[in-house]
């Protein structure tokens, strides 16, 4: 006999599968897959490396979706047979539980593959963390967040490079930027941008009082050099300085760090990780280009929101997530409502529950 809980799970999975099929058609996916494969067999496509790369990425994504659609359909067929036999066979009832468990993972994977369809979703990601007001307390919080994302990347098998690291005077960081290298790094992390709030008993307060701290996270994609963003030399203020900080093996200590200020926008980018001043300058310019591109996209998004009457002020009062360490333990995302009491796991990089819920939440909002 199948339990009530399992029946409820099956209903939820069937609904999710219907939602998937409402936005993607397997026949159309397979047709598109054939077209892309045909284009990649044409030798002339490789004359344009950018176009060839786009087709290759598209082919991989379509293959994954096609294979996972087949897998989910097959699992539902197996489930239907197992359910019919489960009333008379206890072992088959156990098999139903196993299929449902496998289906949960397969449907979730399929959902994410369909959602991660943005132009830059497959790209690497630059992730910056900035402390809010509050001195050492906020700077320590910013470093805790930085570690959380680095641990998350490690769990995913992604590579991490520290691009910039400015230590706080007592503890924590004044500013930090990392490059997370991995397939769909930007797609996964793009909704992590925003204000993150911490409530805890401060280790820096002798009176052991409760403190609230803020830090902002900003995520942008690593973009190709051929993106059409003009950066005029006369708009740049370029400074060099000695790299310093607790970046350990990641940070170069010679007089080669570069800080670039884009005068028209006030955007400041620093890089200290590369081995030479020239390399640091090139990396900083690459990040600046990505930030200017993001700024342009943000302007267009805001124009649309103003037309739709949806523009909201972005301020320290609009936190996307709270991390409560005292008087109880809870991490809660204020957009999706997802929460957990296991703050230690979250701070050790276990944040997929939040990321996956964000992706579904924003996909539904935009559909």
Swiss-Prot record:
Mainly resides where?
Answer: cytoplasm
Query: Which controlled-vocabulary keywords does the entry list?
Result: Cytoplasm, Methylation, Protein biosynthesis
The entry's localization annotation reads: Cytoplasm
What are this entry's molecular-function GO terms? Answer: translation release factor activity, codon specific
One GO term describing the cellular component: cytoplasm
Pfam families to which the protein is assigned, alphabetical: PCRF, RF-1
Q: How is it modified after translation?
A: Methylated by PrmC. Methylation increases the termination efficiency of RF2.
Q: Which domain of life is it from?
A: Bacteria
Stored SUPFAM superfamilies: Release factor
UniProt modified residues of type N5-methylglutamine: 249
Protein task: Peptide chain release factor 2 directs the termination of translation in response to the peptide chain termination codons UGA and UAA.
Among NCBIfam families, the record links this protein to: prfB (TIGR00020)
What protein family does this chain belong to? Belongs to the prokaryotic/mitochondrial release factor family.
In Swiss-Prot or TrEMBL terms, this protein is called Peptide chain release factor 2
- What species is this protein from? Thermotoga sp. (strain RQ2)
